[in-house]
Amino acid sequence: PLRVALVDRILHDPTNVPYLQGEEKFDPRVSALTTASINLFSDLGVWESITGMRCCSYQAMEVWDAEGTGQIHFSAEDIKQPSLGTIVENSIVNTALYSLLNNIENLELLAPLEIEDLSTIQYGDDFRAKLTTKDGRELTTTLVVAADGTNSRIRSLAQFKTREWDYEHQALVTTVRTELPHEHRALQRFIDTGPLAFLPLLPAADSEDERYCSIVWSLVPERSREMLEMTAQQFKIELALNLEHKLGNIEAIEQRFVFPLRQRHATDYFRGNIVLMGDAAHTIHPLAGQGVNLGLLDAATLSGELARGVQAGRNIADPIVLGRYQRKRIGHNLGMMWLMEGFKHLFAEQTLPVRWLRNMGMSGLDNISVIKNHLARRAMGLD
């Protein structure tokens, strides 16, 4: 088997996982996992661990336009699936995945360890990558897989070219407790200031308390600053008002956080023996919660192509092997990115003709079940 070193800037500390600190403590960063991602975690043997901690499946999604009558409703029942997806706190996913590492004999975890420099060296007839850490350690490897996030140090050191732009919006995230139960529904309202999403949560694996939601609100910086400066009571009132009281009043909120929104895509996913995946390769607007799912599909595709290459007797950094990964993923990722970009611009436009067409289009699509259900299945990774 291949020898693998997992280098992480931060050593995962399970004592910092909000889930372990009480039922009413939540991680502000959550992911909406699709069926394809859930299947991957099941294959890895960690899905049972995730569900044993806590997560919340959702059977319906309601989307509507604040500036008119346009709305669309997606239902798991309509596409004959048990759910549309599952909301999971990122720290719970990390905890489950880290628990796997002890069972992998050919893997060594190097953390906390930060990469300072990257170079290519001659190794017989081949070339290898040499990583230098901040503490002066040197690591030599046949292939570097950069999965180090949106501000990837490896991508920068390897001088990958990217296309990127700032959305001039920020995402405000927090966790709230609502007056009315979410009933396992995800809610998304498009407002002139930016989309507001309520994603359902459960405080424990066996809980029936459906009054917790993770919120993601896309706002211009000035507006997000106003929201952060509000008192808890003011913010609760503002939030309930902007969701049109679909879940009644907001009864409690946790700490609010803000992070910038930026779209970025690497023009190539590999250079020499460096390969990018996940947010290091592409950063997408959180409009539909697809970022983590795209990254997981990257990981599944890359591991499949590496295994295929090894079976064929190829070097794992062979351009043929990495090229197959790039061809399979770059088009799919770009397609999803442009779809989200189109949605963003469509709902940002507030002129009367566009608003009228937008509302007509949403309501019309809601009545065409074949197209609507195909979109739902595609978003879930089923088609």
Task: Please describe what each predicted stretch is.
Residues 50-157, 165-170:
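Conserved N-terminal helical subregion
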Residues 223-317:
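FAD/FMN-dependent oxidoreductases across multiple families
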Residues 34-38, 90-94, 98, 169, ...:
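A general structural signal for well-ordered alpha-helical segments in protein cores
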Residues 1-29:
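Glycine-rich FAD pyrophosphate-binding loop
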Residues 6-7, 146, 277, 284:
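Generic enzyme active-site microenvironment
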Residues 41, 130, 137-138, 143-249, ...:
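Conserved FAD-binding catalytic core of PHBH/FMO-like flavoproteins
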Residues 22-66:
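N-terminal FAD cofactor-binding segment of flavoenzymes
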Residues 304-383:
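C-terminal helical "tail/cap" subdomain of flavin- and related membrane-associated enzymes
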